[in-house]
Amino acid sequence: MRPGLSFLLALLFFLGQAAGDLGDVGPPIPSPGFSSFPGVDSSSSFSSSSRSGSSSSRSLGSGGSVSQLFSNFTGSVDDRGTCQCSVSLPDTTFPVDRVERLEFTAHVLSQKFEKELSKVREYVQLISVYEKKLLNLTVRIDIMEKDTISYTELDFELIKVEVKEMEKLVIQLKESFGGSSEIVDQLEVEIRNMTLLVEKLETLDKNNVLAIRREIVALKTKLKECEASKDQNTPVVHPPPTPGSCGHGGVVNISKPSVVQLNWRGFSYLYGAWGRDYSPQHPNKGLYWVAPLNTDGRLLEYYRLYNTLDDLLLYINARELRITYGQGSGTAVYNNNMYVNMYNTGNIARVNLTTNTIAVTQTLPNAAYNNRFSYANVAWQDIDFAVDENGLWVIYSTEASTGNMVISKLNDTTLQVLNTWYTKQYKPSASNAFMVCGVLYATRTMNTRTEEIFYYYDTNTGKEGKLDIVMHKMQEKVQSINYNPFDQKLYVYNDGYLLNYDLSVLQKPQ
């Protein structure tokens, strides 16, 4: 027999002996039966005592504790008289492969857990960011609710009802109005246009309700004026002087702001300018332009053009163009050309809007630039272009003027300076400025919701003086003001929002 098998049998004998002593089950196995298993050569001894081995076999079989360790125990004698036996042990091996699979599964689960945990941490950070944004938005909404400007949820059905009521009123006025019906006809056309605009807004942008409601209020006011004139049998009060003319005594009042919309690049783009192109040859066909600066508040890189105000309101049919050299919010558009301060220089440029290329550049003599004399609260606007009934102007300061405002009339084609006026108003004390009929009007900040038109300089007479015209605003800082002579409106860029105002002028006696 093999040494290993001899060892196993000896071990079994020992276990059986111990079981017999402890359990007192059957007689003990005689030691001579196993004295012949010291090694390989002991097989003959085992054969000579085969009967004793059989007896031992029976004794082992009667030991209950030993028999439980084996699944089978058989023996045989070959033709040489050698006893051979086989022992089958139970399947009690340790499941190493299962433990390895379990370890691998645990490792995979641990990796997945770490990955999900990192996602949770990232989501927690994002939630914190959005929570701050939501808080900021809540504060803005609270401010708007307290202000005279309010945003309401768009109720298109209610607007449609209001428009239909105005249509009925116009029909009644046409039937009963005794005098000229020209204004009534104009109102009817405007109401029809309003109906079309409401239908467009209903299917596209639902965030411009304020602009629509303001137009409805304006139309209702006109209808009331028509009714009053009919009842009192008095002539209709005509609007201010013909657009583009200067037959008046200057600006005396300004309306509440009309919020058009947020600029097309979003909340982060606080600085910029916008307005309506004015062309003396085609005053009623001016396109609308919006030019937000990059978030650094300095570089003018992208701007958009819209053919109509409806296109601007609905974000449709826009031409988006790119330049790489504009600086500050002092941009203006006149006769299909955009006028900008060249980046990091005191040069000015005319950009053709059809080709989006520089048509001409010119150095503005002695002009300070790069924040030397910019407006209060607004950086990079040392050079500010303006448009009025007389053409193109530029407002700036020089070292010689000790920072006071300088006004120059420009040739809109060559950018040559035609004439220059020096004021006594320190430019960094003003928040912004604009021109109307050759008169400079400067604004200053009163508080976070109010500006004041406080100063004027008339280039026609050389006179200057103080004013106190209150100008409400939506946000804290006014970045730019552009005037359009055709509709006599101010186009204001207010911390990313596009506002416009109607100007009231002093009527001269006929």
Curated annotation (Swiss-Prot):
Keyword Transferase: no
Gene Ontology annotations for the cellular component aspect, listed alphabetically: cytosol; extracellular exosome; extracellular region; extracellular space; intercellular bridge; mitochondrion; nucleoplasm; perinuclear region of cytoplasm
Stretches of the chain forming a coiled coil according to its record: 155-234
Induction: By retinoic acid. This induction requires functional NFKB pathway.
Glycosylation sites: N72, N136, N253
MF terms in GO: cadherin binding; structural molecule activity
Chief place of localization: secreted
Protein keywords: Cell adhesion, Coiled coil, Disulfide bond, Glycoprotein, Mitochondrion, Secreted, Signal
Disulfide bonds: C246-C437
Highest taxon of source: Eukaryota
Tissue: Expressed during myeloid lineage development. Much higher expression in bone marrow neutrophils than in peripheral blood neutrophils (at protein level). Strongly expressed in the prostate, small intestine and colon and moderately expressed in the bone marrow and stomach. Overexpressed in some pancreatic cancer tissues.
PTM annotation, UniProt: N-glycosylated.
Phenotype for C246A: Abolishes secretion. No effect on multimer formation
Signal peptide interval: 1-20
Domain Olfactomedin-like: 245-507
InterPro entries: Olfac-like_dom (IPR003112), Olfactomedin-like_domain (IPR050605), Quinoprot_gluc/sorb_DH_b-prop (IPR011041)
SUPFAM superfamilies listed in its UniProt record: Soluble quinoprotein glucose dehydrogenase
PANTHER family: OLFACTOMEDIN-4, OLFACTOMEDIN-RELATED
Known function: May promote proliferation of pancreatic cancer cells by favoring the transition from the S to G2/M phase. In myeloid leukemic cell lines, inhibits cell growth and induces cell differentiation and apoptosis. May play a role in the inhibition of EIF4EBP1 phosphorylation/deactivation. Facilitates cell adhesion, most probably through interaction with cell surface lectins and cadherin.
Subunit details: Homomultimer; disulfide-linked. Interacts with NDUFA13. Interacts with cell surface lectins (locutions ricinus communis agglutinin I, concanavalin-A and wheat germ agglutinin) and cadherin.
Free-text note on domains in this protein's UniProt record: The olfactomedin-like domain is involved in the interaction with cadherin.
Protein name: Olfactomedin-4
Gene: OLFM4
